[in-house]
Swiss-Prot record:
InterPro entries cross-referenced by the UniProt entry: CinA (IPR050101), CinA-like_C (IPR036653), CinA_C (IPR008136), CinA_KH (IPR041424), Competence-induced_CinA (IPR008135), MoaB/Mog-like_dom_sf (IPR036425), MoaB/Mog_dom (IPR001453)
Species assigned in the record: Clostridium botulinum (strain ATCC 19397 / Type A)
The encoding gene: cinA
HAMAP family assigned: CinA_B (MF_00226_B)
Similarity remark: Belongs to the CinA family.
Protein name: Putative competence-damage inducible protein
Pfam families (UniProt xref): CinA, CinA_KH, MoCF_biosynth
């Protein structure tokens, strides 16, 4: 079964609202073996919507729409779909009563505009909406299926999970399963080069790399007639990829880098403190996202000025004068200083030039040092990046977490 997702709403085209519906529906369809061939976004215009439906059904047998089911005049999805399928809109008394009851919960009375939401194509299956006043519906005709859903995610997602998935599962016999591997320390092009044989010879499963800030993900996707068989197809490909990429793979699924690092610290009961200059607390903020980190994360210091580095971290004045604050020597003294001050096993520091000003020929914007102290041993890493201030600060945090992860192995 081939599907298209058609999201309706001028607010989507204007960028006022992020289209999370398409992402959610695509993932859910993949889990039950339905392939999504196209995403479309269209404004609240009946003629354009009719043209989109005609185009979509030229190559798909399933079209799922979201949005345009509200009570106002520019909510035209229902009318457009009825016209496409050459169906009259008729009043559905049960839906009318449910809408009225729903409105009473908000101390509102039924209006003619709200009454519009109780009209549906004559031959359709109505999907109740316990979370709003816009029921959805399913219409089948001439080997075409249209599933019409409300736009707000808190209304659409429960309807999709409870009504749409059971309906679609009866129509398909295949299952698509995916596994995501998370990689950091090497870029997307390097990943693609290292696993080029796998990428060039893929059939089922397929392997697709995706670049994100500071990391690359690999999605391995298999299709079979059962979930178990699909997962079994993934196993040998995943094993081969892990052998090639080794510890550049830090996790899988929805696991974050900070979660992996925090788990190591907690499991090994290694206490940590952070000393940050250019990242200004972002590194500490990432670590404390993890529940339970309070047992090992003792302290975070933002030492932006030279004076605070000297007074708070015991960085030597002579070191600052000789090497400047942006140097491996200062990064190491910062890491050791915070660890000894806080009494922790680990101290980690960041110092650098995040921009947009402050760079020199010798210390350009994007020059970063990460210092690390682990139970008496010290390590330092130099980084050079180009980009805006936010990017440089964020990528520094990612690299600092990865530097710590690799040195804890």
């Amino acid at each position: 079964m081939k599907a298209e997702i058609l999201c309706v709403g001028t607010e989507l085209l204007l960028g006022d609202i992020v289209n999370t519906n398409a992402q959610y529906i695509s993932k859910e369809l993949a889990n039950i073996g339905i392939e999504v061939y196209h995403h479309s976004v269209i404004g609240d215009n009946e003629n354009r919507l009719l043209k989109e439906l005609e185009r979509a059904f030229n190559y798909c047998d399933l079209v799922i729409t979201t949005g345009g089911l509200g009570p106002t005049k520019d909510d035209l999805t229902k009318e457009s779909v009825a016209k496409f399928f050459q169906e009259d809109l008729v009043l559905h008394e049960k839906s009318l009563k449910q809408i009225e009851k729903r409105l009473l919960c908000f101390n509102k009375s039924m209006t003619e505009s709200n009454k519009k939401q109780a009209y549906f194509p004559k031959n359709c299956e109505i999907l109740e909406n316990p979370n709003g006043t816009a029921p959805g519906f399913i219409i089948e005709k001439d080997n075409k299926i249209a599933i019409i859903l409300p736009g707000p995610p808190y209304e659409m997602q429960p309807m999709f999970e409870n009504k749409v998935i059971p309906y679609l599962e009866k129509l398909t016999s295949s299952t698509i399963k995916s596994k995501v591997l998370r990689i950091t320390g090497i870029g997307e092009s390097d990943v693609a080069d290292l696993i080029s044989d796998i990428l060039e010879n893929q059939t089922n499963p397929t392997v697709a790399p995706y670049a994100k800030q500071g990391e690359t993900t690999l999605r391995i996707t298999a299709k079979a007639n059962s979930e178990e068989k699909a997962l079994n197809l993934i196993v040998p490909i995943e094993k081969k990829i892990r052998q090639i990429l080794e510890d550049n793979i830090y996790g899988s699924g929805e696991t974050s880098l900070e979660e992996v690092v925090a788990n190591i610290l907690v499991k090994r009961n290694l206490t940590i403190a952070t000393a940050e200059s250019c990242t200004g607390g972002l590194l500490a903020g990432k670590l404390i996202n993890f529940p339970g980190i309070s047992s090992v994360f003792l302290e975070g210091a933002i030492t932006y000025s030279n004076e605070s580095k000297i007074n708070r971290l015991n960085v030597k004045k002579e070191t600052l004068e000789k090497y400047t604050a942006v140097s491996k020597e200062v990064a190491l003294e910062m890491a050791e200083g915070i660890a000894k001050s806080a009494g922790t096993n680990i101290g980690i520091s960041t110092t650098g030039v995040a921009g947009p000003g402050g760079g020199t020929y010798d210390k350009p914007i994007g020059l970063i040092y990460i210092g690390l102290y682990i139970n008496g041993k010290t390590f330092v890493k130099e980084l050079n990046y180009s980009g805006n201030r936010q990017f440089i600060r964020n990528i520094t945090v990612t690299r600092a977490l990865d530097f710590l992860r690799r040195n804890l192995k």
